[in-house]
Amino acid sequence: MARQAPSYIGSTAPQQAKYASALFSKFCSDIKAMEGTAPLLDLGPSTTRNVMYWLREAHPVSAFDIMVHEMADQVSLDYEDCAFGGVLGWTVLSHLGPRQARQLMREIGRVLRPRGCLFAIFDGDGRRNLGAQRYQIIDAKNLEFEPIEGRRAPRPVLTREVETLFQPFRETRIMVMRHGSREVLGKQP
């Protein structure tokens, strides 16, 4: 009999399901500090809750579930150059092959404004594979996650590969979370 992983979204979660995220908090403060409205691109798998969070903060959001296109040879974002002040990459890079991940990073760099920010989460730390996870915003300092049933497990992405993917960014910060995922914050030059 198959075991189903429990869902912790919206319930009293064990400590590992809800956690404080210093890099997400920094992403939020950087977005709020931008002049004018900073449109955001939310690369899924996202949730209505995440989109609603940004709309309440008065930031227009375009949501695009790149995972629907994960088998495509070409990864492209159908948006104008410099269209977004910030991009959220919810585990998408750890589900793409290395070549597709590099293509997506070039596309993200193209659609981000100068001094724009990318917040990305990688499932697992390159050694441990957590399986596919869905992350949701609680507030500007906290996130929570749950397993995604039926989604193939992400490939292991080593820290060296993460550093290479984020090389074009002016500033990059990487944190390994206690539950095993990695968060990355990159800022455009």
Region locations from a protein language model:
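A short glycine-rich, Lys/Arg-flanked "PGG" loop and its adjoining helix->strand segment in the class I
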Residues: 102-114
